[in-house]
Amino acid sequence: MFDIGFGELLLVMVIGLVVLGPERLPVAVKTVAGWIRALRSLAANVQNELVQELKLQELQESLKKVQEEAGLQNLSPELKASMDELKEAAESLKKAYQNEPDAGSMKASEINEVAQKPAASQVVASSGPSALVDDQAASATKKKTSD
């Protein structure tokens, strides 16, 4: 992704160790990893929303094309009913998409939450690996309940 080799990564870690010290370096690495994770999930959400919008637009275009080609006067009642169902499905998808809360603002708040959490992470880092696992499980539970 960033085209960073092992030597360059090792150099960055040594400089980070000298600048931050052995106590704050794990906290800084964890904070940066949280930011990267939040940004990746934000990008995935934006991509999913674009795909959903394109599918909705394609459905509406195909519906208009069918209406223009066939003409509603020549259709049987069964076909008219199926066309109405397609229209309702397209409208419900459009309404559902418009009623969703902005996923970008939610992810920005998660980024801020991770940025303001380094003090709690420092305590976890000094407590050992079992405390780190407990902290990760608690934060995962917290995220699930907030969704």
Swiss-Prot record:
It is found in: Cell inner membrane. One of its GO terms (molecular function) is protein transmembrane transporter activity. It is a single-pass membrane protein. InterPro entries: TatB. One of its GO terms (biological process) is protein transport by the Tat complex. GO terms for cellular component: TAT protein transport complex. The chain crosses the membrane at residues 1-21. Part of the twin-arginine translocation (Tat) system that transports large folded proteins containing a characteristic twin-arginine motif in their signal peptide across membranes. Together with TatC, TatB is part of a receptor directly interacting with Tat signal peptides. TatB may form an oligomeric binding site that transiently accommodates folded Tat precursor proteins before their translocation. It comes from Photorhabdus laumondii subsp. laumondii (strain DSM 15139 / CIP 105565 / TT01). This is Sec-independent protein translocase protein TatB. The keyword Electron transport does not apply. The keyword Plastid does not apply. Gene3D superfamilies: 1.20.5.3310. The Tat system comprises two distinct complexes: a TatABC complex, containing multiple copies of TatA, TatB and TatC subunits, and a separate TatA complex, containing only TatA subunits. Substrates initially bind to the TatABC complex, which probably triggers association of the separate TatA complex to form the active translocon.
